[in-house]
C-alpha cells in the first residue's frame, strides 16, 4: 500500500483544479443555476477557524450542487475598507492600502490551501477604485431619485474611533467595534432613505421562508411598525404646539405628564435660559444611547415649568418634563405618560410624585377597588374614568379616541416605524469617498460622472485623531463643477456597510468597466440561492442589502425583489480558555494535560481552565488553521468542521476531534488501496443479476447516496458525515468477508467484485464535497482518469433503497399479540404461516378453534378464533 501523503496530494489536486479552470463559470441558460455565497471576509491578516467552518459549509454545498447538474457560482472577495486598516497605520506606520493588500494576498493563499471550489476569476476587493466607482455612481443616482439627502442631525459619536455610527452599530450603548460609550453630537450627515421601503421590507419577510425565524423576527422588531395616533398638545407660555405619537390613545384620560427628548427643539429653547436644564441635557447626551440601556437605566427627568393642555378636556394641564428615556429618533421625540398602564411611565411617576390613575380595568374587577401598585397593568379590559370612552374595550377605545382627535382637527391615526433613515457619513480616510463637492455659492454639487471615481489621496498622515482627508492640504480643494469657483470635496467617506450591500450583485459581472453589473447577468444569477454567515449581521448587513436591492430596482438598475433566497446562520467555533498562575492568558499550544491536571508545557506550573467560549485573540483560545492544515491537511480540517455538531450550533474545537478526522481519512485510503481482493477493471459491464451478498453491498451504497444527498440539501452536515462513516464501515465489513474468501482461495464472485467496485466509486463521489483532495486521489487509485468533480452524483437505484423486509403486526381477535418481519413481496400464505408460528400468537390461540386469518399485505395479519 502506498502511504497517503496529504501535503503532496492536496497540493497536486489544487494545482490540477486551477490549471483546468474547474470552478470558473459563465451564464448558461441551458443549465439550472445555483449561486452559493458565504459572507465575504474583512482582510484582517489571517483566516481563523470561524472562516474555515463558514467556507467549508459553502464549499460542500457548491460541490454537491455541481455534482447534481447545476451551473454553480461560488465567488470570493474582500470587504476591504474599514477602521482596522487606519488603526494599523497608527500602530505600525504602514499605509492602510498596503496593509490591506498584503493581508488580502496572505488570506487568499490560506483559503486556497483549503481546496475551496471558488471562481477566483471573479474576486473583488471593495477598496479598489474599479469597484467603488460604481458605488459612487449608484449614490448619485440615489441622490437624483430622492433616496439620498443631507441634513443636520443628532448622531452616535464614537469618541475612540472619532466617527459616526449608525443606530444598528451601537450595541448596548457602545460602539460595535471599539466598545466605547457612544455620545450624542449634532452634525451634517448624508442619509439613505431606507424608510421609503419600510413597509415592503417588513411585509416581504413573510416570503423569506428559507430564512431562520430568529433573523426574520429580529428584522421585524428593528423595523418596528407601530399603529397609533399623532396629535398635538397646546402649550403654555406661547410655545408652539407639541406633537406626540402614541400607540395607546385609549389611555389619554390616565395621562399625568408629558415628556420630551433631551434633543427636542423645545428642550433646546428652554435650556437657552436655564443653565440647570442645559446641564441635565448634557448629562443625558453623555450616557448610553441604546434603547436597551435606556429601558433599564434609572428614569430621570427635569421639570421645565411648562404645561400642556389635555386634548379632550379644556383647562386640564399636564406638566412637561425633559426625560432621559424619550428618544428623538422614534416617533416625534415627545410622549404623554400614563403611569397606570406603562411600566416606564409608572417608574417615572413614582419617582417624581405624579398621579397614577387607572383607566383600563380588567374584566370582572370593581373599578372602585382596582389600584396599581408597583406593576403597571398592560392587559385587556374595559375603559373607566374616561368620559366618552367608558365601557369600551381597549381596541374600540383606541378607534374612538382617534376619531375624536381627527374630528377636532388635532391629529390623525397613523403608522410609525422604529426604523430610521441610514446615516452613511463616516469621518475616516479608509473608505469610499462620497462624490459630492461643497460650493459656498452652489451648495452641495454632485461630482460629474465623467470625473468618477473620486479616489483617495495616498499622501496622508495618521499622526492625529480624526479624518486625514479633512486635514489634507490639496486633495479637498477643487473647482465647483457648476460655477467654477473655489470649493471643497466632501471629506466624509461612506459607511463600509455600503460596500457589502451590493457586492453579491457585482459577482455576477465583476469585470464590467462600464456598468456596476449587466442586468441580464443579474437576472440569470440572482437571487443568491444560499447565503451563509453569522446571525450577528441580522439587522446590519442583511437589512441594508435588502434595502439596497430595492433602491437599485427603484432606480432601474435591476428587477429583483430579494437578494438572498436562502439564509443559513452558522454557529461559532469555541475552545476552552487557559490562564497561568500570573493571570495571563495562554494559547492552547502552551498547555498540556499531565498527571491528571492541565499545566504549562514549559515549566509544569498550574493552569486554570476556563469556560468554553468563542475563539478570541484577546483570550488566546485560538487555534491557527494554517498549522492544522500543515499538520493534518485541509480535508481533515474540513471533515472535523462538518462532523461533531449541527452546523447552526457552536462547535468545540478539540485535538481528539481533528485526530479522529485524520484517522478516518487514512481508513478510507486503506479501504481503496487494500480491499483484500481483486476488483474488476473500471468500466466493466454490470452482471445480468446479483446475488444476496452483492445486493447487500449495493443496497448500502445506494441508500448512502440518497441519504447523504438529502442531508447536504438540508444542511445536516453532521448527519451526512455520520452516514458516510456508517456506509464506509458497512463496506469495510463486507470487504472483510470477501477478503477472507479470497485468502482461503475462493475469489469473490463476479457480481460481488463488481458491487465492491461500484461501492468504492460511489464512496469516492460521496466523499468529494467534504474531502475533495482525498476523493480525487481515491478516484485515481480506482483506475480512473480525469477529474472526479466532473462526474455526477451517483444515480440511486430506487429498487435498492426500498427496504426488502417489512414489520407486520399480528392481532388475535383484534388485540395486538406480536410483530413479525416478512419479505416485502411475501404472499398471504407465507404471512399466515409466519404469524401462526410466532410463540406469542400460539399462546393466544391455544385450545381455541381457528375461524379465519385475514392478511393485509405488508401491514397486518388478523387471526380470528
Curated annotation (Swiss-Prot):
First-tier enzyme category under EC: ligase
GO biological process, one term: leucyl-tRNA aminoacylation
Disulfide links within the chain: none
EC number: 6.1.1.4
Keywords assigned by UniProt, alphabetized: Aminoacyl-tRNA synthetase, ATP-binding, Cytoplasm, Ligase, Nucleotide-binding, Protein biosynthesis
The keyword ATP-binding is assigned to this record: yes
A Gene Ontology cellular-component term: cytosol
Motif 'KMSKS' region location, chain numbering: 614-618
Short sequence motif named 'HIGH' region, residue ranges: 41-51
Family as reported in the entry's similarity comment: Belongs to the class-I aminoacyl-tRNA synthetase family.
NCBIfam families: leuS_bact
Protein name: Leucine--tRNA ligase
Species annotation: Rhodospirillum centenum (strain ATCC 51521 / SW)
Amino acid at each position: 500500500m502506498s502511504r497517503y501523503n496529504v501535503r503532496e496530494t492536496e497540493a497536486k489536486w489544487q494545482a490540477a483544479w486551477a490549471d483546468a479552470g474547474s470552478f470558473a463559470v459563465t451564464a448558461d441558460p441551458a443549465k439550472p443555476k445555483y449561486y452559493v455565497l458565504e459572507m465575504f471576509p474583512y482582510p484582517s491578516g489571517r483566516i481563523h477557524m470561524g472562516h474555515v467552518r463558514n467556507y467549508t459549509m459553502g464549499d460542500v454545498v457548491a460541490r454537491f450542487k455541481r455534482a447534481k447538474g447545476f451551473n454553480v457560482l461560488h465567488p470570493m472577495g474582500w470587504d476591504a475598507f474599514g477602521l482596522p486598516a487606519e488603526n494599523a497605520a497608527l500602530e505600525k506606520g504602514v499605509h492602510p492600502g498596503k496593509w490591506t493588500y498584503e493581508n488580502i494576498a496572505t488570506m487568499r493563499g490560506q483559503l486556497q490551501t483549503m481546496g475551496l471550489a471558488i471562481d477566483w476569476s471573479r474576486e473583488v476587493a471593495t477598496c479598489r477604485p474599479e469597484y467603488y466607482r460604481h458605488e459612487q455612481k449608484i449614490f448619485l443616482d440615489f441622490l437624483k431619485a430622492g433616496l439620498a439627502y443631507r441634513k443636520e442631525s443628532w448622531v452616535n459619536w464614537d469618541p475612540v474611533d472619532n466617527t459616526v455610527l449608525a443606530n444598528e452599530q451601537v450595541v448596548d450603548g457602545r460602539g460595535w467595534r471599539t466598545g466605547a460609550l457612544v455620545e450624542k453630537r449634532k452634525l451634517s450627515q448624508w442619509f439613505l432613505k431606507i424608510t421609503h421601503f419600510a413597509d415592503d421590507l417588513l411585509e416581504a419577510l413573510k416570503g423569506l421562508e428559507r430564512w431562520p425565524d430568529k433573523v426574520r423576527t429580529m428584522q421585524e422588531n428593528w423595523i418596528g411598525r407601530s399603529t397609533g395616533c399623532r396629535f398635538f398638545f397646546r402649550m403654555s407660555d406661547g410655545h408652539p404646539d407639541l406633537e406626540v405619537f402614541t400607540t395607546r390613545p385609549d389611555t389619554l384620560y390616565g395621562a399625568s405628564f408629558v415628556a420630551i427628548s433631551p434633543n427636542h427643539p423645545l428642550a433646546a429653547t428652554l435650556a437657552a435660559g436655564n443653565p440647570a436644564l442645559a446641564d441635565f441635557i448634557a448629562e443625558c447626551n453623555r450616557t448610553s444611547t441604546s434603547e436597551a440601556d435606556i429601558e433599564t437605566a434609572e428614569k430621570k427627568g427635569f421639570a421645565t415649568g411648562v404645561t400642556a393642555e389635555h386634548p379632550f378636556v379644556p383647562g386640564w394641564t399636564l406638566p412637561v418634563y425633559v426625560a432621559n428615556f424619550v428618544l428623538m429618533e422614534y416617533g416625534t421625540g415627545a410622549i404623554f405618560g400614563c403611569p397606570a398602564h406603562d411600566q416606564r411611565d409608572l417608574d417615572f411617576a413614582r419617582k417624581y410624585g405624579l398621579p397614577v390613575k387607572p383607566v383600563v380595568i380588567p374584566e370582572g374587577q370593581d373599578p372602585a377597588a382596582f389600584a396599581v401598585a408597583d406593576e403597571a397593568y398592560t392587559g385587556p379590559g374595559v375603559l373607566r374614568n374616561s368620559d366618552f370612552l367608558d365601557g369600551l374595550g381597549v381596541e374600540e377605545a383606541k378607534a374612538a379616541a382617534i376619531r375624536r382627535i381627527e374630528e377636532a382637527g388635532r391629529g390623525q391615526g397613523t403608522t410609525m416605524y422604529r426604523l430610521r433613515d441610514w446615516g452613511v457619513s463616516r469621518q475616516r480616510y479608509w473608505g469610499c469617498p462620497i462624490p459630492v463637492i461643497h460650493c459656498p455659492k452652489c451648495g452641495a454639487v454632485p461630482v460629474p460622472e465623467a470625473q468618477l471615481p473620486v479616489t483617495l489621496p495616498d499622501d496622508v498622515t495618521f499622526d492625529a485623531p480624526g479624518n486625514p482627508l479633512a486635514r489634507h492640504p490639496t486633495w479637498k480643494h477643487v473647482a465647483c463643477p457648476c460655477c467654477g469657483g473655489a470649493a471643497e470635496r466632501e471629506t466624509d467617506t461612506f459607511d463600509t456597510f455600503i460596500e457589502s450591500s451590493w457586492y453579491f450583485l457585482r459577482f455576477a459581472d465583476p469585470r464590467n468597466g462600464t456598468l456596476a453589473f449587466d442586468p441580464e447577468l443579474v437576472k440569470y444569477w440572482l437571487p443568491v440561492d444560499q447565503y451563509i454567515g453569522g446571525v450577528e449581521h441580522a439587522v446590519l448587513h442583511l437589512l441594508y442589502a435588502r434595502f439596497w436591492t430595492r433602491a437599485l430596482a427603484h432606480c432601474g438598475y435591476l428587477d429583483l425583489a430579494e437578494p438572498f433566497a436562502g439564509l443559513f446562520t452558522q454557529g461559532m467555533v469555541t475552545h476552552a480558555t487557559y490562564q497561568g498562575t500570573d493571570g495571563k492568558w495562554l494559547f492552547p499550544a502552551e498547555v498540556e494535560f499531565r498527571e491528571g491536571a492541565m499545566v504549562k508545557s514549559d515549566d509544569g506550573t498550574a493552569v486554570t481552565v476556563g469556560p468554553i467560549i468563542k475563539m478570541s485573540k484577546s483570550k488566546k483560545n485560538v487555534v491557527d488553521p494554517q498549522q492544522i492544515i500543515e499538520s493534518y491537511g485541509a480535508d481533515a480540517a474540513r471533515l472535523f468542521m462538518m462532523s461533531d455538531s449541527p452546523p447552526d450550533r457552536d462547535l468545540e474545537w478539540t485535538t481528539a476531534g481533528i485526530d479522529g478526522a485524520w484517522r478516518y481519512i487514512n481508513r478510507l485510503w486503506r479501504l481503496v488501496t487494500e480491499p483484500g481482493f481483486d476488483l474488476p477493471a473500471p468500466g466493466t459491464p454490470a452482471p445480468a443479476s446479483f446475488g444476496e451478498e452483492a445486493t447487500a453491498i449495493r443496497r448500502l451504497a445506494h441508500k448512502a447516496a440518497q441519504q447523504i444527498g438529502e442531508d447536504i440539501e438540508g444542511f445536516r452536515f453532521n448527519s451526512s458525515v455520520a452516514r458516510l462513516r456508517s456506509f464506509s464501515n458497512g463496506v469495510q465489513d463486507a470487504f472483510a468477508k470477501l477478503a477472507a474468501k479470497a485468502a482461503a482461495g475462493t475469489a469473490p464472485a463476479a457480481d460481488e467484485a463488481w458491487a465492491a467496485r461500484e461501492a468504492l466509486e460511489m464512496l469516492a463521489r460521496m466523499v468529494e464535497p467534504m474531502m475533495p483532495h482525498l476523493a480525487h486521489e481515491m478516484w485515481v487509485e480506482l483506475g480512473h482518469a480525469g477529474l472526479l468533480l466532473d462526474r455526477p452524483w451517483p444515480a440511486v437505484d430506487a429498487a435498492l433503497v426500498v427496504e426488502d423486509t417489512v414489520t407486520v403486526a399480528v392481532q388475535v381477535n383484534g388485540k395486538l399479540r406480536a410483530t413479525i418481519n416478512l419479505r416485502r413481496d411475501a404472499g398471504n400464505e407465507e404471512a399466515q404461516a409466519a404469524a401462526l408460528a410466532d410463540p406469542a400468537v400460539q399462546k393466544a390461540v391455544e385450545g381455541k378453534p381457528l375461524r379465519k386469518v385475514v392478511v393485509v399485505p405488508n401491514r397486518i395479519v388478523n387471526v380470528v378464533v
